[in-house]
Structures are given as structure tokens and as C-alpha cells.
Amino acid sequence: MALEIDAKNAAATGDAGTIGKAKAKENKNHNNNNNAPAAGEKNLVNGSSAATKKKGKKNRNKSPPQNAVEAEASAALSNGHSENGDAADANANVLAEKGEGVAAGAVVGDGAEGGASAEGAVAEGDAAAAGEDVDLDALHDIGITVNISSPGTDVLSVQLSSMELVQEIHQLLMDREETCHRTCFSLQLDNVTLDNFAELKTIESLEQGSTIRVVEEPYTMREARIHVRHVRDLLKNLDPADAYNGIDCTSLTYLNTITQGDLLDKKRTRPDSVDCTPPDYVTPGVREPPLLPLHPNIKNAKGPQALKVLTTSAWNPPPGPRKLHGDLMYLYVVTMEDKRFHISACSKGFYINQSTDECFNPKPDNPSHLSHSLIDLLSHISPSFRRAFQAIQKRRTMRHAFERVATPYQVYQWAAPQLEHTVDAIRAEDAFSSKLGYEEHIPGQTRDWNEELQTTRELPRKTLPERLLRERAIFKVHGDFVTAATRGAMAVIDGNVLAINPGEDAKMQMFIWNNIFFSLGFDVRDHYKELGGDHAAFVAPRYDLHGVRVYNAVDIEGLYTLGTVVIDYRGYRVTAQSIIPGILEREQEQSVVYGSIDFGKTVLSHPKYLELLRQAGKHLKILPHSVLNERDEPVELCSSVECKGIIGNDGRHYILDLLRTFPPDVNFLKLQDVQLSKELTEMGFPIEHRHKLCCLRQELLEAFIEDRYVTFIRIAAVHLQQLNAKKQAATANAEKELPAIAEKQEEPNEEQPEKTEEQPAEKEESKPTPSETKSAEAMVNAIREAQSNVAVSNEVQAAEVVKRACAAVGSLKEKEFDFRFNPDVFSPGIRHVDGPDGGVQSLAKQKRLVQDAAEFLVLKQIPAFIKEHMAHSSPPIDGQSLTESLHSHGINVRYLGKVIKMLGQMPRMDYLHRIAILEIIVRATKHIYYTYMQSTEPLHLSAAISHFLNCLLTTGPVNPAVSSDELHKKQPRNNSGKHNKHKAAKASKPQAAAAQNGNATAAGSGGAGATTSGATSSNSDWTLVTPRSLWQQIRKEVKAYWNWELDCDSIESAGAKYGLLRISLLRAFCLKVGIQVLLREYNFESKHKPTFGDDDIVNVFPVVKHISPRATDAYNFYTTGQAKIQQGMLKEGYELISEALNLLNNVFGAMHQENDSCLRMLARLSYLLGDAQDALAIQQRAVIMSERVNGIDHPSTILEYTHLSLYSFANGHVGMSLKLLYRARYLLVLICGEDHPEVALIDSNISLILHALGEYELSLRFIEHALKLNLKYFGNKAMHVAVSYHLMARIQSCMGDFRSALNNEKETYSIYKSQLGEKHEKTRESAECLRLLTHEAVALQRKMNDIYSNGKLTSDLPPIHITPPSMGSVLEMLNTINGILFVHISQKDIVKVRSEIEKHLKTNTDENDVPDESEITSALKTIVAAVNNNDNASETEQPKDEASAAGTPTQLTNGSEESTATVSS
């Protein structure tokens, strides 16, 4: 809050340095939202030993001096919330250097190559900046060392960046252990007070080694409150209560608990000193994993208690006479010694006064002790406080920096322990002291969200620093808006906000809170009557959000969308939207200048909207089309009819109601004039869905157009070859040119599958590629060039070829490849203007195209999705990862039933089949739960939820316990009077225009009137639900929604038939609907009492859907880095991805999912480059970040843990490596059970390490389980299976069981021989292993025969000498299993290969042509691939790591996530 005022004042005066920077000073609790770590939080990281700052190599991006426009824009935006502090980049500072001149995270090294590639990255990925010379040097600043002198502490020497603000030194001091208790001070240099918002480089007298003094300043009321709040935060710092309660963007991480400290500080462990026994719940064969280990060591998490009570006194506020004596406020404290004190805060500091609970005496106590810091005063009066505070501070500073930074969005926990509810005046004040909390204290008014959101998008974006500033501002304001919208939606449903139309039915009520408009997901005024009623109204906000996302991604200047957040809470769906200026002052009909407010009966158009939407439509593949209005006049539209254009009072052109941005899905619409293909009809399509808003996904349209484009090129090439075969003179040219054209067009599809399939959303964010129209023209030109030596008639023939190809693929234009879609083509009630047959405006052609796209989804995309997952390279782990994978292929979740049918016929896809069934059950149950919750009184919520969970997850007794007095009929609350009815109805009218879309959002306000008399009769309906009735409803819902037959009628039959775990179903359901259950072990088999009771429901939390702003330049660097890695240039890739991380830090701050992906990639690259210690340091941060931003049991977190265990082992932390694998295995089994390909990978890793430690029996159990899974999912002849057999043979030979070992090694040899051939290195190694095992087995048998022949044991029988494997060989095998292979190539080999290539190239090129480096490197890669006989790198054992690191390694990795093929010479 403090900072918001500073920022506002700064903005008003136009102070260039201050705009938006004020956020840095703010304590997290004073902020409406804490998503992006502020500058102070960055310094919090810098101050930590974990994040040592590299000299001057921090990527600090500042805007150039702001001109008047920017100053005005920044003033408008968010009162100081526009930026997330200047680069909260804990990450950028700690990337270890890779080779000389490669800075931490800097692309620009000593050589120019890095910089060139970086510029290329931006140029390649950003069409708008194609001509821009990106000066990365300008983004890197120089370091400066200063001394800071504070009262009562030693002089502190700190390294700072010249681009940091003075404010950031404040935050640094407030975070350091020695000075953290100071909040009210100024910084002086040579007795001159420094401006908080000045950059250090602008201070003339500041030099290397200057001393800055900390000077205590007098308190004001505001500063005193900030100080008390800061003290409370310091005392509560270790308490995880806020993370469990989902407050202030705090979240949990348990890596430190599992590793018992920082991994980097640990020494290597000797194998014989490691405790490696796995917990029972980690060993193979566990039925239901326990719940308690999910949150380890929660008893010791809180830390020591320093005070019993710290609260504001009831004697507040100071009376007039005391104000004149300087009293600001009074505090009440109870120490651990049980002493009670009343404390006065005055301008000089804090002192004990003589007041008691009954008597007010504000005079200082005797002897008086005045302290500028409250901590000093409390330490003086309480020895217990002093000891506890020191312990808290010690533990706080020991925590990793990433554990203390706020996350961008709130992460909620689905299980929480019983938390002690303590006295906390500040928490109470936040809840009740004002309607809105701290926003209200901003001078003037509450925040104007719409103005902030739109102003940030208007910021300049021509240069890289400008784009970074703009994206940072967009991200910060968006994050604040999401937090405010979530808070408002919860307040609406809890009944704490007055409706703007209180006289209407609860379902029809709308709300405005904090300048945000809220509406509920019900069909008010029969708006969606024809489209599916409440069902349509419920899904419309989600489709609208998709529309907002894609229009924001296209980012057309001058076209504006509303800030939109969709929140599901307590069974209701709420849409939160920013408010268009002036919309509340006009009737809806006056507001809309484009589109239709009545689904096409009346239609308007507007030239400016046509211009803007036509630009957007090029990227979104939307076809401009004409419809007839009520006067039968044609009206041109460049969007769907429902899309409305409103010009606000601010002159901006807004579009809203974007629910039909994409074409309809005809497979789920029963239309009279549409005949689906035979294949689709046989599959049961069309299926009549419960609403008519089903549309195709953008990812599908992109894949469809790409598929058609490839077909188009092939057809054109074939026709041209036939044409040119007749022309003898042109034959040679034709054969060279045309296949080249076809290949050229096909290459992008093959080279960039990640872009099209895994990251479709990112595609939108990067600058659009040229349209297919231009591509087609380019191809035609190329064809003409190829035919230039032929007669003019051939040009006509070439054009005919293109025409035929266009006709074959169904292009809208006859002579050009053109694929765009009319979103209104099947909309009921809309009258289209039909163009001539064969033309772009031909309605039949448009309909055919939409039908073809829907058919492509079923016949090509779903099989492609299944085929892709057959390799199990990155298998989905839970419903969320399955959904993301479906969406990346453009497959809607409504096709899940079809996907399950296809998976059910494939035993090798059993795990995915089971995950899909769990997801379909959870989603069906969610639909039922929402209806169930809407008819439940707030009084009975915990009883109703626990009863529902009992019915879902148990078959025991489920009698709901509701006390009789609670069942008495409640009197309806008197809704603010009938005389307001007319006024309220009038107010609601214009607002319907403000959020047409809002009509479609979540469902009803629980406290705001949903439980009034109309609902009372059904308030106890929830008590009638039984397990049998609930599962019958689930079956009906699955059949109705997904057209799939669920063959079970209870949780027991579901478990028996489909292998579902109850704990997995509980987790998935709680996360889906927002329930937090008590962390304890649940007995689901109980026959005597219900499994869940009222007290087991700890909380309900909102499930929030919103748009995630992207960092486009960072994305371009990242994708260019990935391309470099694919080409084998690991160092260049590392540098580019480091730079991407720096840019992400600038935009998002230190904590974000995308930062996590960069860290994981950098750790893997460090490991491949031979720096295992650096890999460990980076991966440790990746694990903490994933736990914090994704969740402690998120699939990404499991992946991070497995990577960290490998790097831990490589660094000699053997025991720690096992603990990390045990954690990963536990989480994986909790989420999806033991029957999963990833479990096989983890079990193989565990087995190997246990084998190295001599725990052979345990090791054998894990490898047997891994082998069983590998056989099931990869087949008998797979390389995974060969490796498992080989590992088992190694373990059994160490146990002396040579016969079994021999049998298993024979299996390995058999697989290698059949897959790789007899001469392959792996086959030869296996044959040698067989020979040794045979020798050992024969020797043992001889000894046994001697014993039998002598009839007794001979005392001198030599023991079997079992040599455990060396750590080096175990690491090699671990690398192999985890997809990393080092192939050693000697320098001599490389020289030989190089000369061969040069010879070969010379024969094929002119004498003057010299092959460039990339050609030779490419050829080298080909040869390396040939040497390995196309062997899958992840399934072969590697030679000595040490040798490869010393020579010139070729690294081939094909892990679960990144595949790398590299040659470095």
C-alpha cells in the first residue's frame, strides 16, 4: 500500500524514474496482489548465499527515458503496480559460466558468435523486429561495490548493479538478518539523502567503495503500521499456514525437508555410510499409498514461538491530547513469560506505557526504554523473544531464496493438516477493517482495472527493452487483476457483495466490486434458450476466454479485449470482467456498433472494426463473410455474429462475447442439411451435445491447414513432374526444382513438431508467419522460374497444375491455397449471402471445409495422438497432463469417450486408458457436484461435501450427520427492500451490455441470495444421495456427455475393473472442484463409520481460469536455443536458453512455470557439457520452483525430482539420490498407481543405486517390477526390456544366483542380436557377459559337485567373491536408462571423416564451392547416427564417462523430454 501512494504521486509529477518502480518498496501484505516478485524480492535472492552474483553479468532491462506518452500511460496504469520490480531474477545471477567469455545467462561472450545467434533468435522469431538490430550489450550492466553503514551493526559490503534503484538497497537491508527489523530509514551519501527511485548510475558521487549511511527516520501513522506488519511477517515467516490457506501467493516446497539442507553444501557420501532402506509405501506392490507422506515433517515446520500475542490495543486510536504528544497508535503484547505490555508508537519509535486492560495511562513506563525498532524493544523486555527471534532468523536465512519469493498466481493445496488458529490482529484487520482491503487506501479511488489493462498494451514495443517493459507491465497488471477478481468472486458467492439488481432472482443477479463486473453462469432472460439453456450459459465464459486469449495473442494495435477471469467456487461459475468506460451510462442498443445482440436477427457493421478484425482474421483463419440483417441488406462481418464491438468513452474499440471465434464442431451438432462421411456415421456421429456452442480448437485448425498444405504441395509436385516428363528440354530442371520445392514446404512440418503439437499457444504469441496466400504465390513463382526456359504455354499449364491441386485439397480459391473458416456457417437463425459456386463466398464450400476439419479431428488427429503416445516418451501422468496433451493436438475433451474406446483395444496403452477413465469419472462427478452444491445451505457445506465424498469413494455407511436444529427452516434474508426493484432493474440493463459474456458465467451467488426461500425446500436434498444413486448418476452423465458406457456402479467395481485407486480419485476430484481435505490416513474400507466426517473438510478454494501473458522475445530465444541443441551445438544452445531465462526473469520475476522449463533444460545441458555440479545447482532450483508454482504433487515436479536424483548421484550424493527417487516414486504412485511406464524408469534407477550399495534383495524387487512394466508397455523385443534383463542378471550374479543371471542375460543377448545384429557393440558386450556368467556358473557347480561327492562340507571352501559395481559403471548405466549416451570419437576419426566428406562434396560441387562448417557438422551427425545403427540412445549402455569428457564427445540424448544429437569437435 505504501508504495501505491508513492507511485501515484510520482506518476502525477511525471517523474521518469519513478513510474511503476514504487512497487519495490511494498511489503507483500500491503499489495492487493503479489504475483510478480518485486525488486526487493530480487534483492532478497541476491542477498542469499545461494544466489551469488556474477560480476556485472545481470540482465537488467530498463526502458529508455520515458517520453510524455509513456509517462502518461504509466501514470494511468495501476498506481505503481505496472512493473514487477526491476528484474526479480534470482535465476539470472546464478547460472554458472560455460567456457571462457560466456557469461552467466549472457548470450554475448568474448566471441561475436553468441551475440550473432542471439540476434538471429529475435530476428527469426519476431517478424516485426526482423530489421531491428538487437543490442544485447545494452541490456547488461556493470557491477558496483558499495559499503553500507547501519546503526548498531558492522559495515556491510554489497555488490550492486548500476541499473538498480536505490529502493532496492532498502529491500536488501529489510531482508538481511542483521538489518531486517528496520523499515523506516533513509539512505545518505555524503550527508545527502538519496532519491529512492533513482538508478544508481545516475548518482554522480557514487563510486566503487563509497559508503552509504542508513539514517533512522521519524515514524508516521502509515510507517508505524507498515513496521508492525513487517514484524509480524518476520515472526510468521516459517509458518506454512498462509500456504495452506492460499493467501498472499505463498506456497509449499518440501525439497529442503527431504534433502535436510542445501544439496550444494553436502559432502560426497561413502556407499557404506548410506541408509538406503525405502519406506514401506515406496516398495513395489503397495495397494493404496498413504496420504501423510505427501506433506513430510509438518510438525516441525512452524518454528519457535516468539510471542503469545501481538495485536493492536483496544485503546486505539490515540485521543486528541495524546496525538499532540506524538502518539501514533497503541499495541498490546503478551510475551512467552506471560507478561502483558501496552506499547505506544510515536514518531521517535516504540516504548512501554503504563496502561492496563482497564486503565488508560499513556505515560512511559519507569524506567522508560525508547527503541526505534519494535524488535529491539521486545528483545529488551523478553529474553524468550530474543532467543526465539534469533532462531527464526537463522532458519529463515538458511532457506533457499526461492522458498521465500511470492508466486505469480496462488497455488492451492488439496490436503492440509489441522492448523492451530491463533490470535492475529493484522489478519483480522485485513478481513474486516475495510470493504476492499488495501486498495481503498490509494488516493482518489479504487483501481481502474480496464484503464490499467489497456494502457499496458498501448506501451511501445519497437525495441527489445521496450517490449520487455511492456510485457512486464502487462504481466503485473494481469496478475493483480486475477487476484482481485478471484477475491471478488469468492466475496460474491459468500454473499458479501450487494447485487446491482438486488430485486431480481438470485441466479439473475449481477455485481460490481472493486471496478470489476461479476455475473453468474446461468441463462438469464433465456439468452441461451435455443443453444442449451444453463448448460450453454455455463460453458460460454470458457469459450469466451479462449477467444480473448487468441485475440490477445494476435495483439492487433487498436483492438481491445476485456480483462476476463473465470472462477469456479462452491459449485458456482463466476465471470469477472473489466468494465468498458461509459457502458453503465448507456442502453445496450446504443452501445453496440458492430455485431449482433440477438444472435443475428439485427446485425450491425462498422468500417474501423472491419479493418481491425480483418487483420486479426488473417492470423486466426477467420473468413470475412456477409449476412443479411433485418432489412434484408447484406452486412459484412470479419468475426462471428455474436462478437460485439463497443466504442468506449475512452475512444477505444472493444470486442466482447468471443465465444464463437472458431468454427462449430459438426460432429456434435445434429443439423438437417449436413451429411457426415460414412466412417464418422459408423462411429456414432453426429452426437447431440447438451449445448450448441461446441467449436473446434485453434490447434486443430492449424494442424488441419498444415496437413492440407503438405497434400497440396505433393499433388502439385506430382502433376508438374508428369507435365515436365513430356518436355525433353526441361526434364532435368524439373526433376531438380520441384522435389526441392516440395521438400522445402514439408520441412517445417517435420522439423518443428514441438511447435505445432506441444506448444500451440506459444505459436500464437510469436509474430505471425506470412499467410498461406503468399506461400502459394511464392510456390507458383518458383514453378514459373523452373519452367523459364520452356514456352509460355507451359506457364498456363503450371497454373492449371496449381488449380488442380487447389481443387483436390478443397481450397476456397481456385488458383491459390486459401483455408479460412466462417464461424457462423452453421449458426441457426443467421441468413448468409451465398456467393457463386466455387468462389470464396460459396456457402457450400465453407460448410464442406468445416466438416472436413471435424472429420480430420476424428480420423487423423485422435489416431496421431495415440500413435505418439505409443512410444511412451513423455507419457501423461494424470488427467491434467492428459487434457493438455489432447488440447495440444486440437482434440476437445468431449472426444474423451472416443479416445477411451480406441485405447481400450490396445493393451500397451493400458495406463493411458486408466488415466482417461479416471478423468472422465472426475469430470462427470464435477457436473453432478456443482448442481448438488447449489442447493446446499452455507450452514451445511462441510457436512454436504463430506457426505458427497463418502458416496463417491466408499461403500460403507454414509448417513449424513446433521443436527436437528440445523434442519429448521431458515428465514430468508430481507433483500434490501422492494422499493429498490425499479431502480435495480434499470441499473442492470446497461450492464448487460458491459458483459454480455457475463451472462454466461458461473453459477449463482451462494450467500448473495441463492439460498433464499425459493431454494429452501431443496436445501436438504443432499442428504438423500447414496453411493448407489451417485454412481448411477455418474454412469448416466458419462453416457450423455461422452457417449461412452461406464461399466461400474460403485467405487469397488471401478477399482476392480479399471484399476482405479481411491486416493488418486480423491486427489483428482479435490483439485478439479476446489476442496481441501484434512491430511490424515483415510480408511476407505470402513464398514462401521463413514470415512469422511465434517471435520475432514478443511476448506473450499476457487478454481481459476485465466490467460497467461507470454514473453515473446524469451520464447524466441528459447526456440532458437532448442534448434541449436537439435543441431548438436550444445554450448550455443546453453547460451541462448540462458538468455531466454534472463528475459523471462525480466518479464515474470523469479518465479514462473516457464522459468522452471528453462532451468530444467539448462541443468540437462550443463550435465551433458560435463559440469555435473552446475547441473545439480540449477536443477535444485528447478525442483523448488516447480513445487512452488505447479504444486508439490504436480507431474512436472515428479520429473524434476527424477532429474535431480541423477545429478545428485553424479555428484557423489548417493543416499540423497535415493531419497529423491523415493519421493518421486511415492508422488507418482499417489497420482496414477504403480502400473505406469514412468514407474518402470524410476524403479530401474532405484534398483541400480541399491545394487551399487550392495542391497541386492531390495534392488532385485525394484528391477523385477520395472521388467514387468517394460514387458507390458514396450513388448518382448524392446531395448528397455533388454536393459532390464541385463540389470537383473548383474544383480543376480552379485547374489551368486548364476543360473538365473545366465537365463536373463540370454534374453538380453537374444534381443540385441535380433534388433541390432551380431556385430553390434551391445550384442558383443552381452555375449562377453554370457561367457563370464557361464564360467562363474560352471566354477560354482564344480564346487557344489565336490561337496556332494565328498558327502560333507569342506572347511576350506573358498567364498564366492562378489565385486560390487563401481560408482562409475553405475553412473554410466543410470545415464543410459535416463536417455543420455556419450559416444567417444577420437580426433583421428574426426579428421578422417572430415576429409571423406570434403572429397565427397568436391565431386558434387563446383571447384570454387567450399563446404561450410554446418554442412560438415551435419554430415558428421549422419555418420554418427549410422555408426549407432539407428540405435535408440536411451536404451544402450554408455562407455566410460570420464573418457568421453576428456576427448571429443558426441552426445546423443533421447530422454523423456529433450532429445539432443550433438557433435562437437
Curated annotation (Swiss-Prot):
Phosphoserine modification, residue list: S273
Compositionally biased spans, kind Basic and acidic residues: 742-767
GO CC terms, sorted: cytosol
Bias-annotated ranges (Low complexity): 30-51, 987-1003, 1010-1020
Biased composition (Polar residues): 1447-1465
Keywords of this entry: Cytoplasm, Phosphoprotein, Repeat, TPR repeat
Example of a GO MF term: ribosome binding
Localization terms from the record: Cytoplasm
Chain residue ranges for the region called Disordered: 1-87, 742-776, 962-1021, 1428-1465
Domain Clu: 427-669
Domain of life, per lineage: Eukaryota
GO biological process: asymmetric neuroblast division; intracellular distribution of mitochondria; mitochondrion organization; ribosome localization
UniProt similarity note: Belongs to the CLU family.
Function, as annotated: mRNA-binding protein involved in proper cytoplasmic distribution of mitochondria.
Name of this protein: Protein clueless
GN (gene name): clu
